[in-house]
C-alpha cells in the first residue's frame, strides 16, 4: 500500500465515516486487475478508523453488476457498510456544484450523481474513498479525499 492513505487516524479525526465511491466497490466486486488490490486494502484500512458508508445512489450504481438484490446485499452487507439516506442539503449543494461545472465547460455526460455523492460527503462530514478524485477536489475543496494520488 502506498503512502496515499498514510495518517488515516489523523485524516479521519472528526469525520462521521468514509463514503465509499462506486469505483472502489466495483474494483473489489469485479476483481479488477489494476485496482482490486489497492481498493481492497484501502477499504480495510479505512474500516479500522471509521464506519464505511454508502448511500442510495452508490447502491443503485453498484446494483447494475448484480443479478439479484440478495447478491448485491451479500456484496454490500449492512454490518460492513452503513447505509445513509441523502440529506436535502446535499441535493442543493450538488445542483450548485453541477451548475458551476457546466459553466466551466463541463460536458453533460458527467452525471449529476457524482456531484450528489460529493455533496453528501461534504454535508455529512464524511471523507470519501475514490479513485476519481479530481472532481471532488475541484468542487468540494474542504472534503477529505482518500485516493491513490493522495
Predicted regions and their residues:
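Short, structured coil segments at secondary-structure junctions
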Residues: 79, 139-141
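Alpha-helix capping/helix-boundary segments
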Residues: 24, 58, 90, 116-117, ...
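Histidine- and aromatic-rich ligand-binding microenvironments
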Residues: 20-21, 55, 110-111, 132, ...
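Short, well-structured N-terminal submotif of metal-dependent ribonuclease cores
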Residues: 1-54, 64-74, 146
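Short loop->beta-strand "edge-of-pocket" segments that line small-molecule binding or catalytic clefts
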Residues: 18, 51-53, 80-85, 127
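Short, flexible loop segments at the rims of nucleotide/cofactor-binding pockets, characterized by
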Residues: 29-32, 61, 104-108
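Active-site neighborhoods of divalent-metal-dependent phosphate/nucleic-acid chemistry enzymes
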Residues: 2-5, 12-13, 82-127, 131
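Active-site-proximal, substrate-binding regions of enzyme catalytic domains
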Residues: 67-89
Amino acid at each position: 500500500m502506498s503512502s496515499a492513505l498514510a495518517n488515516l487516524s489523523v485524516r479521519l479525526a472528526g469525520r462521521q465515516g468514509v463514503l465509499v465511491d462506486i469505483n472502489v466497490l466495483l474494483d473489489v466486486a469485479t476483481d479488477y486487475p489494476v485496482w482490486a488490490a489497492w481498493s481492497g486494502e484501502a477499504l480495510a484500512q479505512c474500516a479500522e478508523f471509521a464506519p464505511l458508508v454508502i448511500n442510495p445512489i452508490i447502491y443503485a450504481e453498484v446494483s447494475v453488476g448484480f443479478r439479484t438484490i440478495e447478491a448485491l446485499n451479500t456484496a454490500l452487507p449492512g454490518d460492513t457498510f452503513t447505509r445513509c439516506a441523502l440529506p436535502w442539503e446535499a441535493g442543493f449543494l450538488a445542483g450548485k456544484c453541477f451548475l458551476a461545472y457546466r459553466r466551466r465547460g463541463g460536458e453533460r455526460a458527467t452525471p449529476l450523481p457524482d456531484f450528489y455523492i460529493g455533496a453528501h460527503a461534504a454535508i455529512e462530514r464524511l471523507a470519501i474513498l475514490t479513485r476519481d478524485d479530481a472532481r471532488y477536489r475541484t468542487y468540494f475543496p474542504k472534503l477529505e479525499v482518500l485516493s491513490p494520488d493522495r
